[in-house]
Amino acid sequence: KNGISEIISIIDEFNNKKIVLFGIPGAFTPTCSEEHFPGYIKLYDKIIERGVDNIYCMSVNDKHVMKSWLISYSDDHKIIGIADGNAEITKHFNLISDKTKNHMGFRSSRFVMIIINNQIISLKIENPGELNVSTAENILKDL
């Protein structure tokens, strides 16, 4: 948050809030960097206008990679990054994706969820290699 890395509890962080959480396979990867994340930057205000408290982007990357990737866009976007370095959250939600054939290890599936008061209201998971259901444009339809 605000360029500062800290350990958080997502249960505490998401408590009594309406959250959009989207997951990406990896920071600095082409689709994530050129399409998925920029779409949320572009539509941030429209999503927040629908009563969303915060937008989070999660990836199975360490905090240093995630921080560098987030600030590579600008210092003024408001999307909060979650570095799930050990894939604990990703595994908990059963959103792990085996990318070992591509020499990328285990990553997050590409997904988006709406969470209200720590309850998942909507979850959309992309088919491997696709970017359709988890875009910012599509999440606006569900809000």
Protein language model regions, located:
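Chalcogenol-based redox active-site neighborhoods
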Residues: 1-143
